[in-house]
UniProtKB/Swiss-Prot annotation:
Name of the protein this chain belongs to: Protein U79/U80
Compositionally biased spans, kind Basic residues: 417-432
Transmembrane segments: none
Protein's organism: Human herpesvirus 6A (strain Uganda-1102)
Domain of life: Viruses
A Pfam cross-reference name: U79_P34
Subcellular location: Host nucleus
Length: 474
């Protein structure tokens, strides 16, 4: 490196005329000085000049992105002379010093301005790269200077071209990267579109597979119908088994009520049958044949159960009729005994009419009549107010399954004439016996409701008879 140009300036009595900030990056300043001195060197020779007065103008530009900038210093003299120094490059600024350095291939420049205490100092240096010794020797020759300047220009152009190539290369690389990114994006979009198209086509395939041929659809329809019939049979057998379980010997026939609960059961069975039919579509022929045999055996078993349940119900009804006949005979015998005896105290019964039907279903527990526990209320002996003869009537009503079997027997005093024909000596004894019989009264209630049977009998004979009849009915 070789210092080709040097310039040093010193100015006194410096005054700032104005300062203008055009933008944040451009500033303008104007100064006046009273006296000054400027020394310049070019190669090995130099000159010195003094000034009595003049002005100095400074223009500074700074970049917004980095520390690059430019600085221009113009010096005007009253005699009509002027000097200019400029440089562009890295800019350094402080409160009193502003410096800029320019770096180019073959030539570097440094320009510094310092202002302090009404004094201004300017320094300007140009550095040049020299490759041969004769260039150094002949540096003061104007021809050599022109040659040197040409070389510097060529170097500057070369540098500019290199920078342009680098920039273009970087741009090409960026374009390649962008192109690859675009290709990747296009590939992704195509793949997504293919997936969407495949997903849109899948439901169509499913619908095609769901559509069965006519033969398969007919088989499926027949299978579904058989399963529905089977489900209805299952519902019938369930009700029959409840009847068999609820039947008790000596009980009245149950009264079945078809309610919403059974309808719900049939709906559930239909749903299960439909689900079984849909699940059986994929079974093989062997499985279908095995299921057919199993269903056939189940149907036979259900038929047997229905027949056996009917037999059991008939047997229970026959036993119930026999028990009712026995009760009827016993009541007739008791009435005959009361009529032939000396006392005319008659028994009196009320007919019990069933107000509520007993419902046998899955949700309601069957409660036959025989399960209603009777209880005997034996009241204290009460004295009768009048010794008159008690006239009583007996009315028995017996209900069966086919209808209410009613039997009414009215026993009146048939032996009144015979009683009148007897001697009068026995009349007091009979009166006493009637009084004693009226005093001993027992009330037997056979139901937990308000309906009751009041039996008024004589002595211990009628009480034992009633107890035996109650046990037989139970």
């Amino acid at each position: 490196m070789y210092a080709e140009e040097r310039a040093y300036g010193s100015f006194d009595d410096v005054m700032e005329v104005y300062q203008q900030i055009v933008t944040e990056s451009i500033q303008l300043k104007r100064l006046h000085f009273g006296s000054g001195c400027l020394i310049e060197f070019l190669g090995d020779s130099g000159t010195c000049e003094t000034f009595c007065g003049g002005w100095i103008s400074m223009i500074c530009w700074t970049s917004d992105t980095n520390s690059m900038g430019s600085l221009t210093v113009d010096i005007g003299i009253d005699d009509g002379k002027y000097k200019t120094y400029n440089a562009r490059g890295f800019l350094l600024c402080s409160k009193s010093i502003t410096s800029i350095s320019q770096n180019t291939e073959g030539r570097d420049r440094i320009l510094t301005v310092s202002q302090e205490n009404n004094k201004l100092q300017i320094t300007f240096v140009t550095l040049t790269k020299v490759f041969k010794e004769h260039d150094i020797r002949n540096l003061g020759d104007p021809k050599c200077i022109e040659k040197f300047e040409k070389e510097c220009r060529a170097l500057d152009r070369k540098k500019h071209d290199d920078e342009h190539r680098k920039r273009s290369g970087k741009q090409k690389e960026k374009r390649k990267v962008e192109d690859t990114d675009k290709k990747k994006d296009d590939d992704r979009r195509k793949q997504e579109e293919r997936k969407r198209n495949d997903e849109d086509k899948q439901p169509d395939k499913k619908e095609e597979s769901d559509e069965l041929p006519k033969e398969k659809r007919q088989k499926y329809h027949d299978m579904k119908r058989n399963l529905e019939e089977q489900s209805h049979e299952d519902g019938i057998t369930l009700t029959s088994t409840t009847l068999v379980n609820g039947a008790v010997e000596g009980a009245l026939p149950p009264c079945i009520s078809i309610d919403n609960h059974e309808d719900q059961q049939h709906d559930e069975l239909d749903k299960r049958a439909y689900a079984q039919g849909t699940n059986r579509e994929g079974l093989s022929n062997e499985d279908n044949y095995g299921n057919f045999r199993l269903n056939k055996s189940l149907e036979q078993l259900r038929a047997k159960l229905v027949a056996s349940s009917g037999d059991i119900v008939e047997r229970s009804l026959l036993k119930l009729k026999e028990c009712l006949d026995n009760v009827k005979d016993n009541l007739i015998k008791n009435e005959c005994a009361d009529v032939t005896g000396p006392s005319k105290c008659l028994s009196k019964t009320k007919h019990i009419e069933p107000k509520k039907q007993i419902v046998f279903s899955d949700c309601v527990r069957p409660v036959p009549v025989c399960e209603i526990k009777p209880f005997i209320d034996v009241r204290l002996f009460e004295t009768a107010r009048s010794p008159r003869r008690l006239r009583q009537r007996t009315r028995t009503i017996v209900g069966s399954t086919d209808g209410a079997i009613e039997q009414q027997r009215v026993i009146s005093g048939q032996n009144r004439g015979r009683a009148r024909g007897r001697g009068r000596g026995r009349a007091p004894r009979r009166r006493n016996s009637n009084i004693n019989n009226s005093r001993t009264q027992t009330t037997i209630v056979i139901d937990d409701s308000s309906e009751a049977e009041n039996f008024e009998n004589e002595g211990s004979f009628n009480e034992d008879l009633l107890a035996t009849t109650i046990l037989e009915t139970l």
